[in-house]
């Protein structure tokens, strides 16, 4: 079994690669690819860590690899994690990333369609709302689209909600669960605090707490960008969240039961936008089942109605990028 990280030399990619080297099951293969010439060195660096995961790196500028061609890294892979692209800077929204990152992800997914069409694809690169539909259209054009094998990684939203709720309510963070659905941008993330649990029991929030927590979860990415004063975005927490997700899906492909939130194609006629973050059961072939979202309260329903047209516009933007 093999995982390939595309964008492995970036701020998220390096840390993600390290975490996968530490956490993947013994005997797993880990391929790292980036256009940066340092990528093989990153693989050498983490290969010195004593785990039974085999890491090898490929660079787009490596003479043994066709220029900017990740084909060798993708050969026989089971799971592709895409982190390639530019990161957010102060004043930038995820939408500002679109013009650059859309082209990068489109090119990479075209290679996935060609080299490993049966692989599962997890997209970390922002804007996830738009890049996942781009990937879907690219795979459709290639005749290999399988909605059970494509997902946007929204784990960071769930991780942040869990952390912020545990801090506010002084609960053991390991016992806290908070559903987070919707999209993966400040205007489309929807935490369902009415369903938040600690130690298996529903938590009580005042309306002020709900509104404050909701806004903090939605804008947590901006909080990090501003706190780093121009020195980067949420690379470390994103890498850790991406590693959690990748590891869970990898184990599901090996037969372990796994439920995670992910931005995936919704069931037709469900009333949700075409792509939406749902609770998902993963299995041997990728997505096995999209699980139902419990009824929303009035505040959450209002939020849902507000985000729906924004998310639908994001999705349409992605589709038109591939099919003008």
Curated annotation (Swiss-Prot):
PROSITE patterns: MDH. It is an enzyme of class 1 (oxidoreductase). One of its GO terms (molecular function) is L-malate dehydrogenase (NAD+) activity. InterPro entries: L-lactate/malate_DH (IPR001557), Lactate/malate_DH_C (IPR022383), Lactate/malate_DH_N (IPR001236), Lactate_DH/Glyco_Ohase_4_C (IPR015955), Malate_DH_AS (IPR001252), Malate_DH_type1 (IPR010097), Malate_DH_type1_bac (IPR023958), NAD(P)-bd_dom_sf (IPR036291). It comes from the Bacteria. Its EC number is 1.1.1.37. GO terms for cellular component: cytoplasm. Substrate binds at residues 88, 94, 126, 160. Keywords: NAD, Oxidoreductase, Tricarboxylic acid cycle. The active site is at 184 (proton acceptor). GO terms for biological process: malate metabolic process; tricarboxylic acid cycle. NAD(+) binds at residues 7-13, 34, 101, 124-126, 238. It catalyses: (S)-malate + NAD(+) = oxaloacetate + NADH + H(+). Signal peptide: none annotated. Belongs to the LDH/MDH superfamily. MDH type 1 family. Catalyzes the reversible oxidation of malate to oxaloacetate. Homodimer. This is Malate dehydrogenase. It comes from Haemophilus ducreyi (strain 35000HP / ATCC 700724).
